[in-house]
Amino acid sequence: FDENKAYKALLEAKEEGKIKYIGITSHSLETIEKSIEDEKFSTIQFPYNIIEDQADEVFKKANKKDIGIIVMKPLAGGAIDDAKLAIKYILSKDYIDVVIPGMESIEQVRENVSVLQDTNITKDDELKIQEIRNIMGKRFCRRCEYCLPCPLKINIPQNFLLEGYYARYNLKDWAKERYKSLEVKASACVEC
């Protein structure tokens, strides 16, 4: 991060009293781990939810270093329907400071805030969480790139990402346009 002009500008703004904290957001666990080791950031923001919980140990490490933890994608980009359970799951972790779910209505705000009344996970919640993991676990792309390299050079995570924009976010035209620009389409898959 030393050579990064943006980081230097943020340091300068902090020294001038224009900002209080510098945080980092990433979808790469490796980047988050490095930022914790470097101790240059006051907060980290990373996707975390019932089916994407690979950051647990990294979050605990950050918490021990007094680095704030902000969770994004608590509903896995809309893949998890039960918002209350998803937020409750995250808030039950004492090493997580903030969860930022997307909301489109006052009713969703009320529903999300109501979770704060009780963040303890019950046996029934645990069963629901396991059910979500069983259903989503095998078909949810975590962008880990374990599926790469594809012998046919299909960018598998990118295809899943576009499918999500098409199906969950209803950005059909946007997703189709980007899909057309892919060098190798998912339709070329031979299921090897």
Where are these regions (language model features)?
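Glycine/proline-rich, positively charged
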Residues: 1-70, 75-78
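Structured C-terminal cap/extension of enzyme domains
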Residues: 38, 56-192
